[in-house]
Amino acid sequence: VNFSEFSKKCSERWKTMSAKEKGKFEDMAKADKARYEREMKTYIPPKGETKKKFKDPNAPKRPPSAFFLFCSEYRPKIKGEHPGLSIGDVAKKLGEMWNNTAADDKQPYEKKAAKLKEKYEKDIAAYRAKGKPDAAKKGVVKAEKSKKKKEEEDDEEDEEDEEEEEEEEDEDEEEDDDDE
């Protein structure tokens, strides 16, 4: 029995019930509502999940991964060969191509990604040192953080970076569409 059928049967049954029969369910609903209101008085929402961390637009951007470098090279070729493919289908095709690419053939992309990552790490260290004059004087680049908090921030940065990369891909694809 699917939900819509079940719901219809419940509705029909409710309409045929006497007030006395309905009273039992109404009492249960009132008791559940009272329990809910009691629990909500003491409920404290988890910190930091709803607030989005401020991201400085002047901060260095994270470098693309080897896969994204591969995609930026092969996307125009795929679009040229298959102009009717949707963005999602192009992405699937690129993913398949990457997975079928031999490790030796991935090497240039991985090397370039590693170089870009090194440059990013230097840039972000300089950026953080510049943003904190006291830390720069002492030679400290990163403030110490609890492991859990650091992991949460890293997860947020990764999500934001993925969103940025997707936006950049969309912009690149729009530019490619405009060129055609």
UniProtKB/Swiss-Prot annotation:
<keyword id="KW-0964">Secreted</keyword>
<keyword id="KW-1017">Isopeptide bond</keyword>
<dbReference type="GO" id="GO:0005886">
    <property type="term" value="C:plasma membrane"/>
</dbReference>
<feature type="compositionally biased region" description="Acidic residues">
    <location>
        <begin position="152"/>
        <end position="180"/>
    </location>
</feature>
<feature type="modified residue" description="Cysteine sulfonic acid (-SO3H)">
    <location>
        <position position="71"/>
    </location>
</feature>
<dbReference type="GO" id="GO:0000793">
    <property type="term" value="C:condensed chromosome"/>
</dbReference>
<keyword id="KW-0399">Innate immunity</keyword>
<keyword id="KW-0013">ADP-ribosylation</keyword>
<dbReference type="InterPro" id="IPR036910">
    <property type="entry name" value="HMG_box_dom_sf"/>
</dbReference>
<feature type="cross-link" description="Isoglutamyl lysine isopeptide (Lys-Gln) (interchain with Q-?)">
    <location>
        <position position="33"/>
    </location>
</feature>
<dbReference type="GO" id="GO:0097350">
    <property type="term" value="P:neutrophil clearance"/>
</dbReference>
<feature type="modified residue" description="N6-acetyllysine">
    <location>
        <position position="148"/>
    </location>
</feature>
<keyword id="KW-0472">Membrane</keyword>
<feature type="modified residue" description="N6-acetyllysine">
    <location>
        <position position="92"/>
    </location>
</feature>
<feature type="modified residue" description="N6-acetyllysine">
    <location>
        <position position="150"/>
    </location>
</feature>
<dbReference type="GO" id="GO:0034165">
    <property type="term" value="P:positive regulation of toll-like receptor 9 signaling pathway"/>
</dbReference>
<feature type="region of interest" description="NLS 2">
    <location>
        <begin position="143"/>
        <end position="149"/>
    </location>
</feature>
<keyword id="KW-1064">Adaptive immunity</keyword>
<feature type="short sequence motif" description="Nuclear localization signal (NLS) 2">
    <location>
        <begin position="143"/>
        <end position="149"/>
    </location>
</feature>
<keyword id="KW-0967">Endosome</keyword>
<comment type="similarity">
    <text>Belongs to the HMGB family.</text>
</comment>
<dbReference type="InterPro" id="IPR009071">
    <property type="entry name" value="HMG_box_dom"/>
</dbReference>
<dbReference type="InterPro" id="IPR050342">
    <property type="entry name" value="HMGB"/>
</dbReference>
<feature type="DNA-binding region" description="HMG box 2">
    <location>
        <begin position="60"/>
        <end position="128"/>
    </location>
</feature>
<keyword id="KW-0007">Acetylation</keyword>
<keyword id="KW-0558">Oxidation</keyword>
<feature type="modified residue" description="Cysteine sulfonic acid (-SO3H)">
    <location>
        <position position="10"/>
    </location>
</feature>
<feature type="cross-link" description="Isoglutamyl lysine isopeptide (Lys-Gln) (interchain with Q-?)">
    <location>
        <position position="149"/>
    </location>
</feature>
<dbReference type="Pfam" id="PF00505">
    <property type="entry name" value="HMG_box"/>
</dbReference>
<dbReference type="GO" id="GO:0006954">
    <property type="term" value="P:inflammatory response"/>
</dbReference>
<dbReference type="GO" id="GO:0006302">
    <property type="term" value="P:double-strand break repair"/>
</dbReference>
<dbReference type="GO" id="GO:0002840">
    <property type="term" value="P:regulation of T cell mediated immune response to tumor cell"/>
</dbReference>
<feature type="compositionally biased region" description="Basic and acidic residues">
    <location>
        <begin position="126"/>
        <end position="144"/>
    </location>
</feature>
<feature type="modified residue" description="N6-acetyllysine">
    <location>
        <position position="137"/>
    </location>
</feature>
<feature type="cross-link" description="Isoglutamyl lysine isopeptide (Lys-Gln) (interchain with Q-?)">
    <location>
        <position position="148"/>
    </location>
</feature>
<feature type="modified residue" description="N6-acetyllysine">
    <location>
        <position position="106"/>
    </location>
</feature>
<keyword id="KW-0395">Inflammatory response</keyword>
<keyword id="KW-0677">Repeat</keyword>
<feature type="cross-link" description="Isoglutamyl lysine isopeptide (Lys-Gln) (interchain with Q-?)">
    <location>
        <position position="8"/>
    </location>
</feature>
<feature type="modified residue" description="N6-acetyllysine">
    <location>
        <position position="149"/>
    </location>
</feature>
<keyword id="KW-0145">Chemotaxis</keyword>
<dbReference type="GO" id="GO:0005634">
    <property type="term" value="C:nucleus"/>
</dbReference>
